Amino acid sequence: MSEYTYTVDVIGDDALTDSVIMKTVTEVIDQHINTISEYAFYGCAALQTVIGTNVTSIRSDCFTGCTSLETVSFPVLKVMDGYFRNCTALKNVDLPQLKDIRKQYAFEKCTALERIDLPLCTHIGVGTNYSCYAFHYCSSLTTVILRSETMCSLDDISVFSDTPISKGTGYIYVPQALIESYQAHEKWSVYANQFRAIEDYPEICGQ
């Protein structure tokens, strides 16, 4: 396995695009990087694992087209400004502090992604005047967990289009106290039949 060690605070725009490293690096694990800029790992087809302990900012298309990427972990990231679009092998997503997904195609076509747990997320969308396809064509996505006791706002109903959730075979797990609020919400109501209470499914939701 190839490993590349960074000693800088920011990975800049197009950092590895078209580079020799792009074709060979499989793992990036770093405790110092805080920003991953636009297109930094764009099309890094060999990349399998990214763990950024102190990353607080990821930018547009920074991981788009990383077709071997299976695991990402950003423990302190709060705002999703980057893309994992077309990361077709992505299965393990660890974003425990994420509060806001505000990129139009954040996880679009992550076809291997079956489950995503967003404990603190309170907003998904790019504004009410724009379509949002954050999980569009995530064809394996059957489990979305929104644990926050504050209802997660949704700007556009297209966020789960062409997923098992939109087709009636996937589910969104939220606190029992918020079930009716989600089902009555102007946008979330499209998925009204797919809501389940976290408390009723410990085998799926844990905690």
Go through the PLM ranges and name each one.
Residues 82, 135, 180-183:
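Alpha-helical elements of the RecA-like P-loop NTPase motor core of helicases
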Residues 85, 107-108, 129, 135-136, ...:
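A structural signal for leucine-rich repeat
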Residues 156-163, 180-193:
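Short, aromatic/basic amphipathic alpha-helical patches
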Residues 198-207:
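Low-complexity, Pro/Thr/Ser/Gly/Ala-rich linker/spacer regions in secreted
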